Amino acid sequence: MQFHELQKKVISCMKYENPKILVCSGAKRSGKTYVLTFVFLMHISKFKNKGYSFIIGGTTQASIRRNILNDLEAILGKSINLSKDNHFRLFGNKVYCFDGANADSYKKARGFTAYGAFLNEATTLHDSFVKEVISRCSGEGARIYMDTNPENPTHSVKVDYIDKDGQMLSNGQLNIKAFNFTLYDNTFLNKEYVESIEASTPSGMFFDRDILGIWVASEGVVYQDFNKDIHYIKEANTELKKIFCGVDFGWEHYGSIVVVGLGLVDRYYLIKEYAYKHKDIEYWIGIAKEIIKEYGNVNFYCDYARPDYIYKLQINGIRAINAKKDVLEGISTVATLFKTNKLLILEDNVNIFKSEIYNYVWAKGKDEPIKSSDDVLDSLRYAIYTDMKLTGSKFNRSKFGI
């Protein structure tokens, strides 16, 4: 097995300083999860044939399998199969796998003493689960390992653990040690891959967190890579393999339907914007029918805050589907398309978009935008992000003189 220099420092820390809590945070693809998987394996091996219990915590059972168990299998050279209560045996001990994203997940960790835990993607776990798992690790010699990507610097994982790096117990034992990883620490990544990731990661918060591993608060304009000289076009004489729509219902603020096309080279086009105030659902049904008449029976990905409106669209023969509204992931998706010039806007067919793109800003101290100047941009996000996540309507390839 090979480790880069920072991974070696983590292993050395585990061997010689042996902190009660060891945290690796930082950039994606930097090697922090892999080294902690190895370290956790070393820790369990110290208790061979003791019949003790250990914990692996992750967002879901699927993420635990993907992020940890697959690597464990590769290291051990054997398959890991979970029992009905989601444990497997290792070195004569039991390792329990708990998903910990929900408020009541802490209940899964109750009822036994653990001799160690590995919390994967710790910022995605509920704080009560993290604290319950740590409290369970009361066996003599128990150790806790966490890995995570950076989020807002006020997150409990940073405040309660990372910011206490170097904390000592009264007996001289190191309690908490934290390591920070950047993408550049992983020297096993080839130069071409690193350059590609740099080029495709949106500027600002996303670059600081995903590449530099910095716990930074969001601030300023959300879509920093939008460039009117690049992203506005007059026409898109291209073949489109798919067309779909995003819908954000409104009244005092703008209601919006956007028409989005996906080209043959996987470039998205904002073809047209419909944005109006004080329009009832009957008006939007009419707009949707106009769109269907022009482009075919396309999908409409809708804000599900108004299920009654979605129902009315559906009974009028419109393929209205609940949008996926994950704010940060959706924004990251659209921001990446702007960064890579994979999202272009037909300038003459939009109006409200032109002001929103410059006034859509992050809420101070929060990983979410201010709820203002977001109507067309929300519908655009719903359209693109949902279509990427779902299997959208198939659209016969044809040439549009757009």
Regions found by a protein language model. Give the residues of each.
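ATPase catalytic-site recognition across NTP-hydrolyzing enzymes
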Residues: 186-247
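Walker A/P-loop NTP-binding motif
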Residues: 33-49
